[in-house]
Amino acid sequence: MDCHPAGAHYNKDRLTPDSVSRGFISVMKKIRILVTGGTFDKKYDELTGRLFFRETHVPEMLRLGRCRLDVAIETVMMIDSLDLDDDGRARIVQQARTSDETAILVTHGTDTMVQTARALATAGLSAKTIVLTGAMVPYAFGSSDGLFNLGSALSFVQVLPPGVYIAMNGQHFPWDVVRKNTATGFFELVNTP
């Protein structure tokens, strides 16, 4: 999905207001978004009161956020992260590995986000910047943190050095020093010695 206006690409031969911001050149990277489901993409069935998956909300969210980035969206799976096993994580790793893009954003359920981040970080993808994000409240509810988290993660994936990160609530964390605090509903740094 190309969600930036025509002519917004960086042209190394001609600097434009789109390519220069506050004294530095902003080179637009193509970003691969790997969709895996999670609360981020759940819908609510009013008749049964159950949450379920149909299709991703990411294209709509990018449109509402007036995204100007060059992104490719790929649905890898639509699953609750509590149901995600090692085979599912291997699929996510494989999609990241075969992606031509070096900037990869993964939408993911928050319960096992750190485990998937670990799988990506130990898969030999050291030349790529991979950011995982999700939501505590489904986007379909309207009061979701998903749109904010997606926007933050899109910014982080463009500027962070290669590595694997988790981006939630406007913050980013290296994958190996973060945990989800189930009492507060926030991600936080792990106490390290």
PLM regions and their residue ranges:
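Short, flexible coil/linker elements and helix-boundary hinge sites characteristic
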Residues: Y10-K12, G124
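Short, positively charged and aromatic/hydrophobic N-terminal segments
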Residues: H9-Y10, G23-F24
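Active-site histidine-anchored catalytic micro-motif
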Residues: M28-P193
